[in-house]
């Protein structure tokens, strides 16, 4: 997906940018970028591949080359960025998070007759950050340009711009799908995707942008340049999976939400009389663990770690672009604790079940290690739709998703007309899907969190949360 961090101060901000960006490394492993601005020497920039080397290690050698009182940086799973852009609006730097689904149409509509040459990428696609900048440059000022770009883009656009004056312009997506937060400390202000990133640097919470809000940030403060809109559709997956445990979005902590989510899952199973007799409740590392702790606390079953993830030399497994590599990384990281597996009845909670490839290997791994029973629970509902609003690593087709493939196997095209029923584990079709997946993977039982339970755990009004990947309503 990606994340960003920026800061403006009366003193040098190089280390703040370096560590602030590094604290977003859980959001991507393809590219990292840093850009610092000095009033005398102008912009300094470095972009590196971080596919095989972490951001911090890759950029440490560049730190002596950077100096300045303002800067932005990013972790990107797509484009090389931040970019430097020269236009009638002046020279500025830009970094973005989001996705542009109608890139070709926009190029044809606005740029085909104007001789605009876009930077070629190895994927053959246009750099979406460059396209966003080109749309911004069609207007007479940055604010109007940002609003124009967000209106034209099908998908989402959240961004930071660093101007020649050393000011940061921050803009949250039109419906606030991703967070943008401002921190402050003496003589400095920062802007970040993850709130904990600036807490570790001595900043305190100052402000959270509303949907479509545009804010100017300087060393001495911040001001709204364009007001927030009323509609919000923040991504629910920030709490269930992508967000780091220490972060807060809309005032709701990620780790606390995950505990609450697990508790609600257990509560609902108990009320249905569906809670199995198990020796332990366990979580699939990392983000499945707090959901499992909440489940264990409410169910009264002991929590344990039947396998432990070896992390010192393995990156987060969903990030490598190649699915085969991703699966191999996931497999190599899992180290069993035989004493907690052999002859045991285990209930595992995972943050989600997407394609199911790694899950199959996890179950095989547990049975090979001597587990007697493996009950699986997903901390979110069945994923029925690939995200079209953010650049998640979820595959190229809805049929890459385990739930959709299973529906297709059961009823063919007819089943696609009944996805809402299949997503409800208490319905006849939902029960049929659960049984089929259980048989396919060898689960003793399978359960998904309900959409109502998930929204209860988040605690926001349901019309403020994007649930597209579960029910097709964004």
Over which residues does each language-model region extend?
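Conserved short alpha-helical segments that host acidic/polar catalytic motifs at enzyme active sites
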Residues: 1-210, 216-279, 284, 373
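Active-site proximal loops enriched in glycine and acidic residues that flank catalytic Cys/His/Asp
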Residues: 172, 193, 219, 282-286, ...
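Short, glycine/charge-rich flexible loops or terminal/linker lids adjacent to PRPP-binding catalytic cores
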Residues: 297-345, 384-396
């Amino acid at each position: 997906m990606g994340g960003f961090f920026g800061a403006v101060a009366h003193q040098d901000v190089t280390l703040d940018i370096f560590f602030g960006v590094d604290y977003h490394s859980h959001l991507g492993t393809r590219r990292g970028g840093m850009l610092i601005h000095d009033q005398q020497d102008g912009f300094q920039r470095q972009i590196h591949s971080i596919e095989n080397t972490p951001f911090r290690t890759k950029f440490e050698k560049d730190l002596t080359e950077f100096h300045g009182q303002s800067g932005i940086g990013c972790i990107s799973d797509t484009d090389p960025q931040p970019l430097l852009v020269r236009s009638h609006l002046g020279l500025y730097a830009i970094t973005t998070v989001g996705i542009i689904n109608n890139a070709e149409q926009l190029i044809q509509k606005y740029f085909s007759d104007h001789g605009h040459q876009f930077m070629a990428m190895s994927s053959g696609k246009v750099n979406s950050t460059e396209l966003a900048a080109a749309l911004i440059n069609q207007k007479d000022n940055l604010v109007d340009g940002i609003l124009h770009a967000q209106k034209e883009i099908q998908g989402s656009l959240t961004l930071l711009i660093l101007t020649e004056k050393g000011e940061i312009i921050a803009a949250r997506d039109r419906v606030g799908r991703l967070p943008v937060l401002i921190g402050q400390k003496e003589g400095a202000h920062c802007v970040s995707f993850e709130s904990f990133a600036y807490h570790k640097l001595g900043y305190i919470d100052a402000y959270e942008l509303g949907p479509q809000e545009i804010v100017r940030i300087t060393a001495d403060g911040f001001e709204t340049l364009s007001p927030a809109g009323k509609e919000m559709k923040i991504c629910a997956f920030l709490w269930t999976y992508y967000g780091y445990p220490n972060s807060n979005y809309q005032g709701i902590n990620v780790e606390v939400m995950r505990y609450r989510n697990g508790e609600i899952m257990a509560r609902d199973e108990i009320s249905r009389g569906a809670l199995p007799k198990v020796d332990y409740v366990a979580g699939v590392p990392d983000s499945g663990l707090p959901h499992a702790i909440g489940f264990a606390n409410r169910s009264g079953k002991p929590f344990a770690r039947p396998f432990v993830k070896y992390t010192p030399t393995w990156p987060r497994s969903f990030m490598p672009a190649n699915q085969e590599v991703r699966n191999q990384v996931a497999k190599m990281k899992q180290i069993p604790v035989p004493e907690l597996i052999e002859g045991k009845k285990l209930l595992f909670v995972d943050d989600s079940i997407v394609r199911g490839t790694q899950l199959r290997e996890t179950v095989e791994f547990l049975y090979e290690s001597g587990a007697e029973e493996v009950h699986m629970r997903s901390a979110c509902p069945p994923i029925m739709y690939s995200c079209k609003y953010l650049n998640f690593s979820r595959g190229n087709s809805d049929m890459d998703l385990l739930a959709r493939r299973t529906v297709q196997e059961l009823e063919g095209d007819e089943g696609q007309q009944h996805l809402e029923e299949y997503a409800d584990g208490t319905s006849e079709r939902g029960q049929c899907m659960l049984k089929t997946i259980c048989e396919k993977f060898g689960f003793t039982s399978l359960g998904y969190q309900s959409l109502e339970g998930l929204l209860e755990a988040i605690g926001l009004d349901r019309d403020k949360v994007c649930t597209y990947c579960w029910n097709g309503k964004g």
